[in-house]
Amino acid sequence: MLLRLDPKADQALQIAALGHDIDRADELRKVRRADYDDYDEFKAAHARNGAKILRSTLAKCGVAGSIADEACRLVTLHEVGGDPHSDLLRDADSISFFEVNMPLYYQREGRDETMRRCIWGYGRLSGRLKKIVKKITYEDETLTQLLKNAIQQACLKD
């Protein structure tokens, strides 16, 4: 997804895009949603943990320190952005949820949690990507309608 948004993304940004959710692959070290009352606190802890795990992995692979430092900085910020590179990573991650992950998320988490996640995810999109997400449809019309409802609710919050 990152390279669709910026075909010239540098190496650190590409590494961050590939590794931003690395903590989810380790059952023993991953951050669990159930341990947090606040979703944003959970996401911040997930981002910090992912950066920590990625740093260790990159060191073992011999990645140059400056590239590893930037990749880990970006992973730490991938949920919130804050500068052009981390904003781009956040956008790539966000649009990927809607284009790729939402149907599986719906199967795993159910309607209410998917609605909540869609509202949250839509709210963090840049204006450019909000226009793209508004055009997304799914084979399952239930999901298309859920997304439309989530967008309406997210717009009411703004």
What are these regions (language model features)?
Residues 1-10, 19, 63, 78-158:
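Divalent metal-dependent phosphate-bond-processing catalytic cores, especially two-metal-ion Mg2+/Mn2+ enzymes
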Residues 10-35, 50, 54, 72-79, ...:
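His-Asp-centered metal-binding catalytic motifs of divalent-metal-dependent phosphohydrolases/nucleases
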Residues 13-14, 44-51, 89, 118:
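Hydrophobic alpha-helical segments
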Residues 1, 44-61:
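An active-site-proximal "capping" alpha-helix that borders the catalytic cofactor pocket
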Residues 36-43:
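Short histidine-centered catalytic/ligand-binding loop motif
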